[in-house]
Amino acid sequence: MRRSYFLRCRVVAAGSITLNDIAGAFLLTFAGLFPIVNPIEAAPFFFGLTSGLSAAERNALARKVAINGFALLLGSMVLGPYLLEFFGIRLPVVRIAGGVVVTALGWKLLTQEDWSDHAGMPAGGRRKVGSFYPLTMPLTVGPGSMSVAITIGSRKTPGIPPLTEIAQKMTGALLGIIAIALTIYLAYRFASTMARVLGESGVEVLVRLSAFILMCIGIEIIWNGYSALIALPH
């Protein structure tokens, strides 16, 4: 009886650790990418670029952009760190540099009036609109978003972690990117009503709060990269 009770406690504890690791990786990925991707801010640009299309065509484009954005972010997160390492750049250095970039992006979002990955995109006008260019890149996923994804992908535990821990973090990161893709689709799908509901002040508040979280994540990534760098043999 007592043995079965302890076994149940161990199973519950293991399950909670698994959920905590997945939730932590999910929150890190989503909170790091959302302020830069910021589909709520990009939604009016999307609506302006697709204003000549029917509602059905606009919805189809929103779905394609979400899928393309998911593929770009996932590719940057998975392959980006190893491509840099292939060129002889150590991953801890990549983490430090990426952390500086993330912190700088967060600071710009927090202090400047008009700065984002969508800078320079026209709010209206007519141009040939494609699901990849310009709607996916650079309107939705630009260089800032991709650099954040690479930095998050390079954030690894020192040493050789167990396979279960790797699987949990990969699952959480994947869910985070899926959540970003869903926010892209929903923001673009309801772009015509979102700006009217939130208003300029609502979008401003959301961006500033997200920017502060992004700065904290950037500083934490810098510290992890520095800790890993000084631990390497010279």
Where in the sequence are the language-model features?
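Short, strongly hydrophobic alpha-helical membrane anchors
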Residues: 2-24, 158, 228-234
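Small-residue-enriched transmembrane helix starts and helix-helix packing motifs
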Residues: 10-35, 112, 119-136
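Structural signature of hydrophobic alpha-helical transmembrane segments
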Residues: 25-42, 91-101, 172-184
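Juxtamembrane transmembrane-helix termini in multi-pass membrane transport proteins
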Residues: 25-77
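Transmembrane-helix boundary and interhelical-loop signature of multi-pass inner-membrane proteins
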Residues: 54-55, 75-97, 183-226
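A small-residue-rich subset of transmembrane alpha-helices
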Residues: 55-81, 156-195
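Membrane helix-loop-helix hairpins that form the core translocation module of multi-pass transporters
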Residues: 59-113
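Transmembrane helix exit motif
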Residues: 100-122, 217-228
